[in-house]
Each structure stands twice: as C-alpha cells, then as structure tokens.
Amino acid sequence: MSDETVLPLQFTEAAAKKVKLLISDEENPNLKLRVYITGGGCSGFQYGFTFDDQINDGDMTIEKQGVELVVDPMSLQYLVGGAVDYTEGLEGSRFIVTNPNAKSTCGCGSSFSI
C-alpha cells in the first residue's frame, strides 16, 4: 500500500519546475500558479493560468518542488482526475491541462466542453 495521497488534480514535475523558474525570475517567492476555468473559447469553457500571491477560502493547493498550484472550488469540479503539465515543442512552450472530463477540445487545447 502506498503512502502517497491521491489528489483530485495532478501537478507534474515539468510544470512545477517551470513554475519554480518563473517565480525565481519574478523575485517574489509568495507567487503560486493558479489554474482556473472560465466560460468562453470555441468549445464553451477555457483554461486560464495566472500567478497569484493569495490563497482564498476553499482553494485547493498542491505543492511540488517547493511551489504551489492553486485551484478554486468551482474550477476544481471540472478538473478532477486531470493534470497540469508543461510542454515544449514545435508549437512553442505552454502549460497544458489534461482533462478526462472534457467531451471535446478545440485544436489549440485551451478550450473544452463537458
């Protein structure tokens, strides 16, 4: 049996490493990466990322490599079982969300429908 806690959302090593680097560049160790869902995009909902130095009541935090990912409760319900990752490729570098709850996604991967 594993001692590792199963979290409703995964924060990959690659994403944590990039967040740590970006926070270092900003010279503000209180920053956290916030992922959120808003209405919009070509599929109905879209993912958003921002740096935030606040944790609000009800927010879930996931710590990895000394940095935190923050998700509000409304967004979390759409992200359960998913993962926040960071990728670099021919199309550029970006944070991405792998979301098993999405019935369809747009070509750019930043919007989805449930």
Curated annotation (Swiss-Prot):
Transmembrane segments: none annotated. Its cofactor is iron-sulfur cluster. InterPro entries: FeS_biogenesis, FeS_cluster_insertion, FeS_cluster_insertion_CS, FeS_cluster_insertion_RrpA, HesB-like_dom_sf. One of its GO terms (biological process) is iron-sulfur cluster assembly. Keywords: Iron, Iron-sulfur, Metal-binding. Iron-sulfur cluster binds at C42, C106, C108. Pfam families: Fe-S_biosyn (PF01521). Binds 1 iron-sulfur cluster per subunit. It comes from the Bacteria. PANTHER family: IRON-SULFUR CLUSTER ASSEMBLY 2 HOMOLOG, MITOCHONDRIAL. Required for insertion of 4Fe-4S clusters for at least IspG. This is Iron-sulfur cluster insertion protein ErpA. It comes from Yersinia enterocolitica serotype O:8 / biotype 1B (strain NCTC 13174 / 8081). The gene is erpA.
